[in-house]
Amino acid sequence: MTLIEEILGGKSGESVVRRVDLVYAHDGTMPLIIEAFNKVFATVRARAYIFFDHVYPAPTVKIANLQKEIRDFAKRHRIPVIEGQGISHQLVVEMGLTENSKIVVGADSHTPTLGALGVFAVGMGATDVAVILGLGKTWFRIPESVGVILEGNPSRYVMATDVILHLLSLLKDYDMNYRAVEFFNVPFSLDERLTLTNFVVEANAKTGIIGEEYTGDGYVKELEIELNSLNPLVAKPHNPANVVPVEEVEGTKIDQVFIGSCTNGRFEQISKAAEILEGEKVAVRTIVGPASMNVYKRMIEEGVARKLIEAGAVILPPGCGPCLGRHMGVVGDGEIVLSTTNRNFRGRMGSPNAQIYLSNPITAAVSALYGEITNPEGAI
Amino acid sequence: MKARGRAWKYGDNIDTDVIIPARYLNTSDPKELAQHVLEDLDPEFRYKMKPGDIIVAGENFGCGSSREHAPLAIKAAGVSAVIAKSFARIFYRNAINIGLPILEAPEAVERIETGDEIEIDFSTGEIRNLTKGEVYHANPFPEFIMEIIKAGGLVEWAKRRLAK
């Protein structure tokens, strides 16, 4: 029996109705949730939270009005609203909201991030989440799981992002739709574990989860990843699975570097980038987006913010930042970006004519210094 | 329930960012969203398509973000159905929830070309290619999903559950 079969209490392939222990949404998805909710329900019957992280503080009157509408709805139904404190997935972890929870649904596709804590967490759309708010439950199709067992320890330039980029290329021709990934023997810190379950969504996985002991029983596929033999990787435009070794794109001129987001905006990741930038000057626009106010506070307390600022980077208020091209750090026509986020779809960060490359934060920081994609090995 | 229209064919992995770019998400008005449908994939699409037309695509249609704006934009543009080899799971749920007809039919996708006149009978899952004179069959929906579709979407399904 897989971890997820155990949590959902059934066999893969079955559709089951289950109580949702925690449901959350953000400023981007709430307006449609409110619309759907108001068609059927009068009372919220779920443990719910709302986070303002996508476009905060509001840059336009239209967005300010949408956010006002969300606040009014939340007040009426006594749902806590957490504004500007960081990205929803990160805050759910920091606030300990998954304690005593087994099943979590978020109105955001990167909700599986929480699988790093051993919970079953999936993203859903507005109407699904509205119905969860009203009923406190929803239906799930229990997914089959792929077991991914990590072996050894990575070299100093290899991070959780590279493990996922490697996994994306391994699973490129494997049908992951409606299937999940269960990770075992993970040697990373919590900051990096969250990257694994966050980023695995891009393999089209329904969710990711990290377990303690691998039983091998009930998995559709099993993969072992030798961490010692991994090298820094890069995803080329316009798909995260378009993965190549960093050497292959070395020398590609870039216009902007973004280090942050729910993928790589935690303290360990930003401080690794800051170590590289310390005492140097960036050659291109470099934007850093802490995943939460706690991360930002610690960056200030431990001198990480100073290193970044002195190197010429711009630190954004905590939130989703340039990742989805709606707020700060939007990229223009023909620009080339190296980003530590999880999606490089066409138009994702702004102009549809921009090109987005994805890498780990160390590669991104080194590349910021050279103004071109640079292999950290040998460069630092 | 039947649909009839011309096919517009696209490839694999059509993501929600190209279906409705985030820069247009400052509204939940379906009409406004429809003005930008598929803009970053095929900027001409919304001018050349006619109400009733059908989108045909490869594997993993609708991958990426959970934004329900994506199926809403497609539906509001007047697209009568999306036929794909497979759908990304959040898009699949979203489309059914808001009543955008979707069909998984790999064989149909292989055969249909842009411009073909297509007729779909949703009750039987039969897809007729009137241009080529061929008939294909969509994969049947799981029983559980059929229940939601028959109820007229998730909101109606939930209403009935509440009434019980």
From Swiss-Prot, chain A:
Reactions the enzyme catalyzes: (2R,3S)-3-isopropylmalate = (2S)-2-isopropylmalate
Top-level taxonomic group: Archaea
GO molecular function terms attached to this record: 3-isopropylmalate dehydratase activity; 4 iron, 4 sulfur cluster binding; metal ion binding
Transmembrane regions: none
Biological process annotations from GO: L-leucine biosynthetic process
Binding residues for [4Fe-4S] cluster: 262, 320, 323
Cofactor, free-text remark: Binds 1 [4Fe-4S] cluster per subunit.
Alphabetical list of Gene3D superfamilies matching this protein: Aconitase, domain 3 (3.30.499.10)
Keywords of the record: 4Fe-4S, Amino-acid biosynthesis, Branched-chain amino acid biosynthesis, Iron, Iron-sulfur, Leucine biosynthesis, Lyase, Metal-binding
Pathway(s) served: Amino-acid biosynthesis; L-leucine biosynthesis; L-leucine from 3-methyl-2-oxobutanoate: step 2/4
Cofactors, names only: [4Fe-4S] cluster
Pfam families: Aconitase (PF00330)
Annotated EC: 4.2.1.33
Subunit structure: Heterodimer of LeuC and LeuD.
Entry-linked PANTHER family: HOMOACONITASE, MITOCHONDRIAL, HOMOACONITASE, MITOCHONDRIAL-RELATED
Family that this chain belongs to: Belongs to the aconitase/IPM isomerase family. LeuC type 2 subfamily.
Job of this protein: Catalyzes the isomerization between 2-isopropylmalate and 3-isopropylmalate, via the formation of 2-isopropylmaleate.
Name under which the protein is recorded: 3-isopropylmalate dehydratase large subunit 2
Originating species: Pyrococcus furiosus (strain ATCC 43587 / DSM 3638 / JCM 8422 / Vc1)
From Swiss-Prot, chain B:
Superkingdom assignment: Archaea
Enzyme Commission identifier(s): 4.2.1.33
Pathway(s) the chain acts in: Amino-acid biosynthesis; L-leucine biosynthesis; L-leucine from 3-methyl-2-oxobutanoate: step 2/4
This protein's UniProt keywords: Amino-acid biosynthesis, Branched-chain amino acid biosynthesis, Leucine biosynthesis, Lyase
Molecular function per GO: 3-isopropylmalate dehydratase activity
Catalyzed chemical reaction(s): (2R,3S)-3-isopropylmalate = (2S)-2-isopropylmalate
SUPFAM superfamilies membership: LeuD/IlvD-like (SSF52016)
GO BP, one annotated term: L-leucine biosynthetic process
Entry's transmembrane regions: none
EC category name: lyase
Pfam families tied to this protein: Aconitase_C
InterPro entries reported for this sequence: Aconitase/3IPM_dehydase_swvl, AconitaseA/IPMdHydase_ssu_swvl, IPMI_Swivel, LeuD, LeuD/DmdB_bac, LeuD_type2/HacB/DmdB
Cited function: Catalyzes the isomerization between 2-isopropylmalate and 3-isopropylmalate, via the formation of 2-isopropylmaleate.
Subunit structure as annotated in this protein's UniProt entry: Heterodimer of LeuC and LeuD.
Family: Belongs to the LeuD family. LeuD type 2 subfamily.
PANTHER family with a match to the protein in the record: 3-ISOPROPYLMALATE DEHYDRATASE SMALL SUBUNIT 1 (PTHR43345:SF2), 3-ISOPROPYLMALATE DEHYDRATASE SMALL SUBUNIT 2-RELATED-RELATED (PTHR43345)
Protein name (database record): 3-isopropylmalate dehydratase small subunit 1
Species for this entry: Pyrococcus furiosus (strain ATCC 43587 / DSM 3638 / JCM 8422 / Vc1)
Gene: leuD1
